[in-house]
């Protein structure tokens, strides 16, 4: 514990909060190229084949990003837009791919929460 004299001389140093989406370099989204598209299994107690992609961003960082929604058209060399947001049951996946922008198509036959999945309004 410092003395009062030491605090007068140096003061306290503020703690710097760790950034959760460091690869975006402060941007809300970043463009990137898929280097690998594959499925992985979640941690216990969940069970599924979650669709993920390794993406090389314009910030020269390679990240693992989740592909939300049912079905996708992504393959190697697809251009994608990546945002922050982790997937709780996939360790190391801290980014999500934005559906309906660049090479990523929106989810087909989506009725609710359409804007999150890049789905157009159905013509009635």
From Swiss-Prot:
Instruction: Quote one Gene Ontology molecular function term.
Output: structural constituent of ribosome
**Basic residues bias locations:** 108-118
Q: Does the keyword rRNA-binding apply?
A: yes
Region of interest (Disordered), residue spans: 1-30, 105-124
* Gene3D superfamilies xrefs: Nucleic acid-binding proteins
Report the residues modified as 3-methylthioaspartic acid. Answer: 89
* InterPro entries per UniProt: NA-bd_OB-fold, Ribosomal_uS12, Ribosomal_uS12_bac
Q: Which UniProt keywords apply?
A: Methylation, Ribonucleoprotein, Ribosomal protein, RNA-binding, rRNA-binding, tRNA-binding
tRNA-binding among the record's keywords?
yes
**One Gene Ontology term, aspect cellular component:** small ribosomal subunit
Oligomeric form and interacting partners: Part of the 30S ribosomal subunit. Contacts proteins S8 and S17. May interact with IF1 in the 30S initiation complex.
The entry's function note states: With S4 and S5 plays an important role in translational accuracy. Interacts with and stabilizes bases of the 16S rRNA that are involved in tRNA selection in the A site and with the mRNA backbone. Located at the interface of the 30S and 50S subunits, it traverses the body of the 30S subunit contacting proteins on the other side and probably holding the rRNA structure together. The combined cluster of proteins S8, S12 and S17 appears to hold together the shoulder and platform of the 30S subunit.
Stated family: Belongs to the universal ribosomal protein uS12 family.
Q: What is this protein called?
A: Small ribosomal subunit protein uS12
Which gene is the coding source of this polypeptide chain?
rpsL
């Amino acid at each position: 514990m410092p003395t009062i004299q030491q605090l007068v001389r140096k003061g306290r140093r503020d703690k710097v909060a760790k950034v959760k989406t460091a690869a975006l370099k402060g941007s809300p989204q970043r463009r990137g190229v898929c280097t690998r598209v594959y499925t992985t299994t979640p941690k216990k107690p969940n069970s599924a084949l979650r669709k993920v992609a390794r993406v090389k961003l314009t910030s020269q960082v390679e990240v693992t990003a989740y592909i939300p929604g049912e079905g996708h058209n992504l393959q190697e060399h697809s251009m994608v837009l990546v945002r922050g947001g982790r997937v709780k049951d996939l360790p190391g996946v801290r980014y999500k791919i934005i559906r309906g922008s660049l090479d990523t198509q929106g989810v087909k036959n989506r009725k609710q929460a359409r804007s999150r999945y890049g789905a157009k309004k159905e013509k009635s």
